């Protein structure tokens, strides 16, 4: 029995040592490609979830890069099968920016692909590409906190603050750890990182299983894929919408809706 206990202790120490080295390699930055599935946990679908659902973006692939200062994401919905992202996000400790120009381009292309003549009626995008969380909140008629994702940058890859856990939907052969933040609020985000045990021994990118809950936004996200240690240089987008563009964007959205109704009626 004593030998068995010693073996277990040694195995646990080795595993934690491997995790320690792996976490340190990710602390400076990483790149990743992950399949994702987002579900709503709120009684009423949250604003951001509704936007994604309208474009079939609640499941698909997310490619991105991470540094301790910022996070950059590209979303590729499973339903579209397009080589172009639905939208891009830039998340720093100070703000969340959404690529509204890319989202509009995706919408316009999906319409003109089915109704080529609609391209004459639907104008091209002629504003700054990125919309801020405050501008998006104003457009959606919600509070600023509903469009802010800065909490995604609060998770700390600090070995002293990482707790070993075993989630209900754990995958076989994975070690799971909960990353903590300094936010003690009841609705603070919770991130559980699962790393394939065999991947801890490899120099290449390990397979991961990530569970992310953001109670403040009423969403749960499950991600699977690979993460690679990297040292990317992320800079905030310079092509940004002005506050005065919001009225133009509202008018543009109304134009698109009117054109879609017209071409669908003409085609029926």
Predicted features and spans:
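Subset-of-secretome marker
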Residues: 2-268
């Amino acid at each position: 029995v004593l030998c068995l206990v010693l073996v277990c202790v040694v195995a646990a120490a080795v595993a934690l040592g491997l995790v320690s080295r792996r976490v340190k390699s990710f602390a400076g930055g990483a790149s990743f490609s992950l399949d994702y599935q987002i579900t709503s946990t709120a009684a009423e679908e949250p604003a951001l979830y509704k936007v994604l659902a309208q474009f079939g973006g609640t499941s698909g692939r997310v490619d991105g890069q991470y540094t301790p200062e910022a996070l950059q994401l590209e979303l590729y919905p499973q339903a579209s099968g397009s080589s172009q992202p639905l939208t891009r996000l830039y998340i720093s400790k100070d703000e969340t920016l959404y690529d509204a120009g890319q989202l509009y381009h995706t919408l316009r292309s999906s319409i003109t692909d089915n109704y080529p003549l609609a391209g004459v009626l639907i104008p091209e995008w002629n504003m700054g590409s990125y919309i801020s969380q405050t501008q998006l909140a104003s457009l959606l008629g919600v509070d600023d906190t509903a469009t802010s994702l800065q909490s995604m940058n609060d998770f700390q890859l600090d070995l002293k603050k990482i707790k070993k856990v075993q989630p209900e939907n754990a995958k076989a052969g994975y070690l799971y750890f909960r990353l903590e933040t300094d936010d003690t609020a009841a609705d603070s985000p919770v991130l559980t990182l699962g790393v394939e045990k065999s991947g801890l021994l490899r120099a290449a990118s390990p397979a991961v299983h990530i569970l992310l809950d953001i109670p403040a936004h009423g969403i749960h996200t499950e991600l699977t894929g690979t993460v690679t240690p990297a040292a990317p240089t992320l800079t905030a987008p310079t092509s940004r919408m002005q506050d005065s563009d919001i009225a133009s964007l509202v008018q543009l959205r109304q134009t698109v809706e009117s054109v879609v109704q017209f071409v669908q009626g003409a085609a029926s």
